[in-house]
Amino acid sequence: MEITPKLSVTEDKIRLLTVKTDMFKTACLTLNVLVPMGEYAAEYAVLSSYLVHSSKKYDSLIKLNSRLEELYGALLSGSISRHGENYRIQLSITCIDDSLTFDGKSVTGASLELLLSLLTKPSADENGFSPEQLSTEIRLTAEDIEGEINDKRSYAMTRMLETMCADEIYGLTKNEILENVKKVTPQSLLAAWKFMLKNGIIQLNAIGNISEDDCKKKLREAFSDVGERTPYEPETVFVEEAEDLTELTEEL
């Protein structure tokens, strides 16, 4: 059986990539959000962790884990990575195929609803995100950044890129991000999240036994309160000439 990916754009200017198939025992649903590095770099580093630990409906990790158990042990993850002068925030959930459930209910559909709610309905109000949870997320994010030095290969690659791109946004150093992470407030995190929803480039990848129409319907419902979206235009800085060789040695 041939598997054919289908790419479309919803009325909310969200990219949708669907690969509908019943060949697998699991479904993988992934939200990718592209945002510019710069003003909210530290906030995005925190958001990538914060968003997969709670939501408005499941306002604690215990409640969220309980919901994941109800979805037959669905696996949830969040990450952030650099792509040029942009950050890619990725939220992903993996669940069993609907044909394997005992009661015949749609685990895939429910998992997609949960994933979308984590992005569009986090545990925040008009005053900002929860100060208590934010404190925990800042600590976890800081520990993750500081811990990279223990992976010498990753640390060396990071330092090389920071040195090569010292005069570019892409060269934003871990120390600069770490310093700003500790200054993140509930209000600044809320501002970054609002920008992400309104102006981020969002793509949903849905692989499994779920249709394009079902995905579009759930996307429409999830983003109904967001308003008109205006995704930003990414800009890439090209360096046309090679500069002098720079050597850097650090003793650890």
Where are these regions (language model features)?
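His/Glu-rich zincin catalytic helix
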Residues: 1-72, 177, 190-252
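Active-site glycine-rich loop that binds ribose-phosphate moieties when present
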Residues: 181-191
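A common structural junction motif
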Residues: 113-125, 221-230
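Structured segments of extracytoplasmic/periplasmic soluble domains
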Residues: 50-53, 71, 117-122, 144
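Short, polar/flexible loop-turn hinges at active-site or ligand-entry regions and domain interfaces
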Residues: 54-57, 99-102, 121-130
